[in-house]
Amino acid sequence: MICKSQTCTKIGGSTNSTFLALIPKNKGATDFSRFRSISLCNTSYKLITKIIANRLKKILSVIIPKNQGGFIKGRKILDNIMLVQEAIHSSYHRKEKGIVIKLDLTNAFDRVRHDFLFSVMEKFGFSKVLITWVKACIASPWIALLVNGHLMEFFQASRELRQGCPFSSLLYAIQASVLSFQLDYYQ
């Protein structure tokens, strides 16, 4: 059942249920980190999140810092890699001292704090209605592992953004923008 009001706080029933398929990254994978998880979301859920994603896409390129290349239409992470290489090369030839920091955000989608994300969205000026719909979509998802074609029991997830969900990468970009702003501030 999908809620019909603008104050929707929870998407109920099977709409917020997801099957999580684990695909081995290489042959003979036994450790959980050697699997890629794919979220097989309900079609109604995907439609709702696609509508929200389309709204987010219209404004993210304006509010997300230009140096943040990932997940924003028209930007590429490769551009940032080339920019860093050029900066290092230039500093080396001018004999300037500096520091380079590489951050590895492994499994970053699994470590999103929802309360922080919603706070950032409020600071950016997103409408309460949009934030409420995002909350309804990512709050209390029910997940069942799909192992060798068999479903395991459903459990409730708490802090992840679903990979394969139309707006997960955009929500992650919103949260990650805080780091970009902080790096710019202390530059």
Model-derived features: where do they sit?
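Nucleotidyl polymerases of mobile genetic elements and RNA viruses
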Residues: 1-187
